[in-house]
């Protein structure tokens, strides 16, 4: 029988509900419990798939092809459970489903209202997403008091009553600011945040007090007194130098013991030795490299959250401090390749649209010609093919149809718009995949023996997650291969190019998939680990 921990946030946004929730989940998992996590987003978009990276940050793709909130990436990095489309839903998705049922007549002519129809659908999805887990942590996006969050808060209020206090609890994250001039932390914002919760029928069972200073015992006692929360359940969570310390911080204050006792669960003690090893490797590196990351969303690094974390994981695996030099690809267009000088390797991640693409192509050329280790991901592979066609084959008009529909050499094109030898457009079956023209979710990939990518994975067949509309044009592929482009990975049916490499280069790998979505701090990822090793070799050679 599943127990539920509902997680809310107060005072301000960006307190780290996802990290705190995932850290608690990691401790409970370390005690032998089956744990899952859900993220409920109050915005009206159906999913984040079409949202601007500058506003929303990264779109995290699940194994089954759902485009979800970046917090699901945190969940998968902290616990072993694989997230699915059932682990994330939005207001837009809820209303879409309810309205579809209304149009079908499923409500038998009833007046459709927020209560009970919207709240019932929210509760149904929470229960479905929890599945057969021992404990499900359910994070409500936004901040208590936001008008968008009200149906979700009402739904969890109802669900707490329905399942009973032995199966549901509320964990509230709140800001406890430190006033430097007074030399003390202030508890009043937390008191008011809890008051707001209680006004809608929600009494927190646990308070996570976020601060840049430790919240001392006297402050915690005061908070407990004014909020009706047990003193042992008022947890201090100050800023740390690595988020992978947080499971240990929460465990040291007995949060998991409180949860287990409250739910009456019989389980083992927590073994956090894996996390201790991660923290030790992170904070005590033996080597150091600098990697230039050339992207187009550098104003909001959350747009590359999983990728940045994956590079950190590769550093942990190699006992190496990885310094990422963030470079806007438009700056390369304006200032040239001097921005890349001194980097031990170059990383070009994915993206959509024309802006900044020429800067990425220039970065690829610099890496190829100067024998600097290169890793391209998604668009990073496509620009590698374009650069090869332009500068090795001499096809100066080579491009992707995403950027130039009239290119004389469209080496990259929409999955549905291949032209055959006569110029007629060929429609591919992939058009019916989830997401229409978007290829989403886990796909098998066959690796060529003896290739760099095969050396990294040590396997003939791998499974990685995709999120793209464009692919290498198979009609021009034979000429590209004849000129020296190495195709080292193909889709399971052999029809699509998944990985390319460069001959006579120490380490040049570009993949169409997104390996960052499956990297974790405890296991790392073979491709990123190999990339950092190549960067180390480059640095030592210099």
Curated annotation (Swiss-Prot):
Residues that, per the record, bind CTP: 13, 146-148, 186-191, 222
Binding-site residues, L-glutamine: 351, 379-382, 402, 469
One BP term from GO: 'de novo' CTP biosynthetic process
Residues reported to bind Mg(2+): 71, 139
InterPro entries: Class_I_gatase-like, CTP_synthase, CTP_synthase_N, GATASE, GATase1_CTP_Synthase, P-loop_NTPase
Family annotation (Pfam families): CTP_synth_N (PF06418), GATase (PF00117)
EC code(s) of this entry: 6.3.4.2
Sites where the protein binds UTP: 13, 186-191, 222
Domain of life: Bacteria
Additional notes on this entry: CTPSs have evolved a hybrid strategy for distinguishing between UTP and CTP. The overlapping regions of the product feedback inhibitory and substrate sites recognize a common feature in both compounds, the triphosphate moiety. To differentiate isosteric substrate and product pyrimidine rings, an additional pocket far from the expected kinase/ligase catalytic site, specifically recognizes the cytosine and ribose portions of the product inhibitor.
Name the record gives this protein: CTP synthase
Gene from which the chain derives: pyrG
């Amino acid at each position: 029988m599943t127990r539920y921990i509902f997680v809310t946030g107060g005072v301000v946004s960006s307190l780290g509900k996802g990290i705190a929730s995932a850290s608690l989940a990691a401790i409970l998992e370390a005690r032998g419990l089956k744990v899952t996590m859900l993220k409920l987003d109050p915005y009206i978009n159906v999913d984040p798939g079409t949202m601007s990276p500058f506003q929303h940050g990264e779109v995290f793709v699940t194994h089954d092809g759902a485009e979800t909130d970046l917090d699901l990436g945190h969940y998968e990095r902290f616990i072993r459970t694989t997230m699915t489309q059932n682990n994330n839903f939005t207001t837009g998705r809820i209303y879409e489903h309810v309205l579809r049922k209304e149009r079908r007549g499923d409500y038998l002519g009833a007046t459709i209202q927020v209560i009970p129809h919207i709240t019932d659908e929210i509760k149904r999805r929470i229960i479905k997403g929890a599945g057969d887990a021992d404990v499900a942590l359910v994070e409500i996006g936004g901040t208590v008091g936001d008008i968008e969050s009200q149906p979700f808060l009402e739904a969890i209020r109802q669900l707490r009553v329905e399942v009973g206090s032995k199966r549901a609890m509320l964990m509230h994250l709140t800001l406890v600011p430190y006033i430097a001039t007074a030399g003390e932390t202030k508890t009043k914002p937390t008191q008011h945040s809890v008051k707001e919760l209680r006004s809608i029928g929600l009494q927190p069972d646990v308070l996570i007090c976020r601060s840049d200073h430790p919240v001392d015992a006297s402050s915690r006692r005061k908070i407990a007194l004014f909020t009706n929360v047990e003193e042992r359940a008022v947890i201090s969570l100050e800023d740390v130098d690595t988020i992978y310390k947080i499971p240990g911080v929460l465990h040291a204050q007995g949060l998991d013991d409180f949860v287990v006792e409250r739910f009456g669960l019989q389980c083992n003690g927590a073994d956090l030795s894996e996390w201790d090893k991660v923290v030790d490797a992170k904070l005590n590196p033996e080597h150091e490299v600098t990697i230039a990351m050339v992207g187009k969303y550098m104003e909001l690094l959350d747009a590359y959250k999983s990728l940045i974390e994956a590079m950190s994981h590769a550093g942990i695996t190699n006992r190496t401090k990885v310094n990422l030099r963030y470079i806007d690809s438009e700056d390369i267009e304006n200032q040239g390749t001097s921005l890349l000088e001194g980097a031990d390797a170059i990383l070009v991640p994915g993206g959509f649209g024309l802006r900044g693409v020429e800067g990425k192509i220039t970065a690829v050329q610099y890496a190829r010609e100067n024998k600097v280790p290169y890793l391209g991901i998604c668009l990073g592979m496509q620009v590698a093919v374009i650069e090869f066609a332009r500068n090795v084959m001499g096809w100066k008009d080579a491009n992707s149809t995403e950027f130039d529909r009239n290119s004389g050499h469209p080496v990259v094109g929409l999955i549905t718009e291949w032209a055959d030898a006569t110029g007629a457009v060929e429609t591919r079956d992939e058009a019916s995949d989830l997401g229409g023209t978007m290829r989403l979710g886990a796909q098998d990939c066959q690796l060529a023996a003896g290739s760099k990518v095969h050396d990294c994975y040590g396997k003939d067949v791998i499974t990685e997650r995709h999120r793209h509309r464009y692919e290498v044009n198979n009609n021009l592929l034979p000429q590209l291969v004849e000129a020296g482009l190495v195709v080292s990975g193909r889709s399971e049916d052999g029809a699509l190019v998944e990985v390319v490499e460069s001959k006579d280069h120490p380490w040049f790998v570009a993949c169409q998939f997104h390996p960052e979505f499956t990297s974790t701090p405890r296991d790392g990822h073979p491709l990123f680990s190999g990339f950092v090793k190549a960067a180390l070799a480059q640095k030592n050679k210099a």
